[in-house]
Amino acid sequence: MSLFKYAFSTLLLLFCFTTLKAQTLNPDKSYEFACVGFYNLENLFDTIVDPDTNKILQEDFTPKSSKQWDSKKYYGKLDNMAEVISKIGVSKSVPQGAAVLGVCEIENKSVLDDLVAHEKLQDKNYQIVHYDSPDKRGIDVGFLYQPKYFTVTSSKSFTLKLPDNPNWATRDQLLVTGELNGQKMHFIVCHWPSRRGGQKESSYKRVAAGELAKSIVDSLTKEDPLAKVLVMGDLNDDPVDPSVRETMNSVGEIENMVTGDMFNPMESLFKLGIGTLGYKGAWNLFDQMVLTPSFISLDNSFSTYSYFTAKVFNNSFLKNSSGKFEGFPFRTYSYGKFINGYSDHFPVYLYLVKQK
């Protein structure tokens, strides 16, 4: 029996304050579950400067830099990241946690190799899909998967370009197609352009990123109208911002969806005041998952993998315990001082469910 398959009685463990209202299940039937996650690893850099690249941030992450980024700090960061990832989505229903996990703010494939080899993740046997991005900060997106549950059939990297600024570059968007316990799915991992220069002034870049993501989705659903496509990433905008709601045609309530819409379960969480990162004492929810309608079981039959519930993973150990930023993410550096935290973002994840 798959480790995802458990009796309905375990479902009570899936609920907490950071849970969006779940779909309705029949207590007389049994179901199997799968977890999909996303985590911004906040500048997971090694200590080595690549002489063949000209990336802005890599000079900051060396022993001689102002950050004094040495092997001890690097391996400590890996330990922290592995600890978090090992716990994302873990429950009695899903003891193996995230079957697939999108990540961002990684320097290269080498740091992912080091991460998945960590003793805290060895039981998951995570495999990697990664492409180098042209981003001038030197950071990429990546995709981790447990081969016991997910099989990759294809992958492709898409570059975001701005016609009026040919020298500008950002992170590529990563499309991974495969089978989750035998069912075909597509995952798009994103890290949209930041708000540097001002939210309003930079919004056109995120709209362009949303247009690229939506074009990938549309190409997949044109080929297969029932394609299960999940877009996940740090979008650097909230669920209600135009780049997400309008460009992606996303809707936060299933009952409000019409033809052509996508479902964004993070919108309801955001409206409850829940976030994944803080800025000037307020919450943002930049880390999101947006799904095509084929993930919604309108008749609650759950004959195929369908959306069940979404969460922000914000356990207490991931938060500042005191001070000005109490309750907000416990990050690696604060005002240039190394504080040995985790990330400036909380991870997000959701559960998919289907009837046995």
Indicate residue ranges for each PLM-predicted region:
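Bacterial Sec-dependent N-terminal signal peptides
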Residues: 1-25
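Metal-dependent phosphoester-hydrolase catalytic domains
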Residues: 22-28, 219-229, 237-356
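N-terminal, active-site-proximal structural segment of metallo-dependent hydrolase catalytic domains
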Residues: 22-118, 129-135, 139-141, 318-326, ...
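Active-site-proximal beta-strand/loop segments in catalytic clefts of secreted hydrolases
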Residues: 39-42, 104-106, 130-134, 146-147, ...
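Extracytoplasmic/secreted cell-surface and envelope-processing proteins
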Residues: 46-48, 110-113, 137-140, 196-199, ...
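Sec-exported extracytoplasmic/periplasmic mature domains
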Residues: 86-90, 108-121, 149, 215-225, ...
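Structured beta-strand-rich core segments of catalytic domains in phosphoester-bond hydrolases
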Residues: 100, 106-192
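Extracytoplasmic, non-cytosolic globular domains
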Residues: 130, 174-269
